[in-house]
Amino acid sequence: PISIKSAIENFSNISKNGKKKYFFFGDMMELGKKSHIYHKKVTKFINNSDIDKTFVYGKRSSAAFKFIKKNKRGEILDNIHRFNPKISKIIKNGDLLMIKGSHATKLHKISENYLRGNNHAL
């Protein structure tokens, strides 16, 4: 949770310059039995940030989604393969996207694929 807090704080320090900030939040897998508490805590960081919309992927992140302020909610994605088509319709040139989650969620594959096909949006 410390690394995700730092990531959100650093993301918030980047100037929006009239553009939008999107956060794709995947499960943090290595947290043990108190995982739900830590996922809920992340929503507080999101709510206190300048992130415009948050999309979540994974059982734990999806359960915490309801704690994100309504105006900051993107949606729950139940299939990792729906990410690129969904986000490609939303993100405009110059918008900012942060993807964060455990390696086990394979989110790195999304960012690799997204950068290959849509690097103009980052």
At which residue positions do the language-model features occur?
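ATP-dependent carboxylate-amine ligase
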Residues: 1-122
